[in-house]
Amino acid sequence: MSNFWESSHCRRWLVPRTALPAGRDALIETTRWMVVLGCKARMRQRVIATAIVLLRRFALASGSDWDEYAPRAVGVACLYVAAKAEECPMQAKHWVRYASHHAGYGTSLSWCSA
């Protein structure tokens, strides 16, 4: 049997909120935007959750350099990779279309009652 408490995920990726990079507000805003984009693209919740995990891991791995990256471009890349990983692929051109169409979209999730 596998033990979560001895896994690499638990040892390496579970960190306190204070350990997140300085651009935490951008990380939160990007996460909300990814949820909106994933709902608009009719992606499964598991794909969106995997994309958020990938985004957080990228932010932790990049450390203080998080501010140098375009958060929404990284978010779209995480959604694309998560869709591939969860075997729910969508072509990259469709993600780009959704992202450009909803670039200025607010973070209200009231319409997303899927």
Q: What is the role of each PLM region?
A:
Residues 22-114:
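Structured all-alpha helical bundle cores of eukaryotic regulatory proteins
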Residues 1-17:
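An acidic, Gly/Ser/Thr/Pro-rich helix-cap/linker signature
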